[in-house]
């Protein structure tokens, strides 16, 4: 609906966690990263993909570094790390206070390179209207609308992957972008798609009003 570089990911500041050479020398490993993550999630996490994420983390950060994400570095030129989010070790790779923005820009650049090579087609400024279901309820594509010309088009597909991002505006108070409405989530839910794990939708507590101003940032 909006340019990729205006999506809410540009507001993410923290960083990405993974085991690294420095933490390994201190006794860290992927199982400890896994334990930190599951414990931090109050044991609600589906654990197999958490372990896969911890195993893949070092390679993912290395790939992003090679794609041009300007991670902070030490005076020796190595990736700088910090502790973040209750971790036991300094696992977090970060790009100043704009990690989300830098990741988004690097990945957007790769997507546009793939489009230039004819490998993918980007539909920017198009809004998702709904799924195309056959009589058996099997998804066969989706319907989208050009928000400039108002043209409506149906796209045929073997599979439709929903990656809609956050939907924080379903709460009365939220610090999320005005585009995080959850509209796409609602449309597919109304078309019989199962919705689960709603407790993992982030409620950014800095937006909760209180008598004490210390609660606000």
Question: What residue ranges belong to the model's regions?
Answer:
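A short alpha-helix capping/helix-coil boundary motif
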Residues: 37-41, 87, 161-166
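Glycine-rich active-site loop/strand segments that organize a redox cofactor
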Residues: 18-53
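Residues forming the flavin
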Residues: 1-32, 73, 97-217
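Helix-loop-beta segment of a Rossmann-like dinucleotide-binding subdomain
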Residues: 43-47, 80-105, 168-172
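A conserved beta-strand/loop capping segment in the N-terminal third of enzymes
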Residues: 52-89, 211
């Amino acid at each position: 609906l909006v340019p990729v570089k205006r999506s809410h990911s540009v507001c993410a500041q923290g960083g990405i966690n993974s085991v690294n050479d420095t933490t390994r020398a201190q006794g860290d490993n992927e199982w400890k990263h896994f334990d930190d993550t599951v414990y931090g999630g109050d044991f609600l996490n589906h654990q197999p993909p958490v372990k896969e994420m911890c195993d893949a983390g070092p390679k993912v950060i290395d790939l992003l570094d090679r794609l041009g994400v300007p991670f902070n570095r030490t005076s020796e030129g190595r990736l700088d790390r910090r502790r973040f989010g209750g971790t036991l070790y300094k696992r977090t790779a970060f790009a100043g206070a704009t990690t989300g923005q830098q990741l988004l820009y690097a990945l957007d650049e790769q997507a546009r390179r793939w489009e230039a090579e004819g490998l993918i087609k980007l539909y920017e400024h198009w809004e998702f209207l709904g799924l195309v279901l056959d009589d058996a309820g099997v998804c066969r594509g989706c319907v989208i609308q050009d928000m400039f010309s108002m043209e409506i088009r149906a796209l045929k597909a073997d599979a439709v992957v929903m990656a809609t991002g956050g939907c924080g505006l379903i709460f009365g108070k939220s610090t999320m972008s005005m585009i995080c409405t959850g509209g796409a989530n609602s449309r597919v839910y109304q078309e019989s798609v199962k919705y689960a794990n709603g407790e993992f939708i982030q409620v950014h507590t800095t937006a909760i009003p209180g008598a004490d101003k210390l609660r606000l940032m």
